[in-house]
């Protein structure tokens, strides 16, 4: 009877230990590996040839862009800063001196800036990246003690949306002389992505052996690089000396009218 009691005690402890291990393993979240293989470069080199310098100054306002929620704040800031730098480079390449205005609002021009600026360039818009609903699928992990991975997945194609509007202003009056808009949804940019997140439940035993992959951040950076290059290419075509000098008569009339 004593031997049988020891056997039962051992079996009970073994069962308890096994249950504890299972509980411990079930409580572990699966590991997600986020790839970091793409750099956010936002590069562009003006395609137009450098032209003869003019004795004219253009005021360049800071871009007033809004971004979709999946674009990180640091990417937003770099996109905005690089836009300012590259548009400045494009205008300088067209023979203009550029005065950077630390505001996106034309009402913040100083009187001196209004007086010396031939034109002003303002930019606003929405930079949006979204999954293509026709080519994106979602798979949620089902709860379970054994075979639940504990990982939810979204796999598909990231595409751009939104717009960028560029307005040419006469600084003294604040009047718009011209504008052009780029529809980002028309860009042929498609980035495959896999976004993996932890499920609302912890997953089963198999989740301890599963490693999830998430390359969605790389897809965002790659798409932003291409969007940026496309925007700058259009800027390069529109902000030429020939086009900008065509506003000279109207700009002069508006400035003189304001000075009266």
Curated annotation (Swiss-Prot):
Report which residue ranges the record marks as coiled coil. Answer: none
Signal peptide from the UniProt entry = 1-27
UniProt-recorded name of the protein = Neuraminyllactose-binding hemagglutinin
* Alphabetized UniProt keyword annotations: Cell outer membrane, Lipoprotein, Membrane, Palmitate, Signal
Question: Which Gene3D superfamilies does the record match to this protein?
Answer: Putative neuraminyllactose-binding hemagglutinin homolog like domain
Lipid attachment locations (N-palmitoyl cysteine): 28
Gene Ontology cellular component annotations, sorted alphabetically: cell outer membrane
Alphabetical list of InterPro entries matching this protein:
NeuraminylLac-bd_hemagglutn, NeuraminylLac-bd_hemagglutn_sf
Upper classification of the organism:
Bacteria, Pseudomonadati, Campylobacterota, Epsilonproteobacteria, Campylobacterales
Instruction: Cite the positions of S-diacylglycerol cysteine lipidation.
Output: 28
Question: What is its subcellular localisation?
Answer: Cell outer membrane
* Pfam families hit by this protein: NLBH
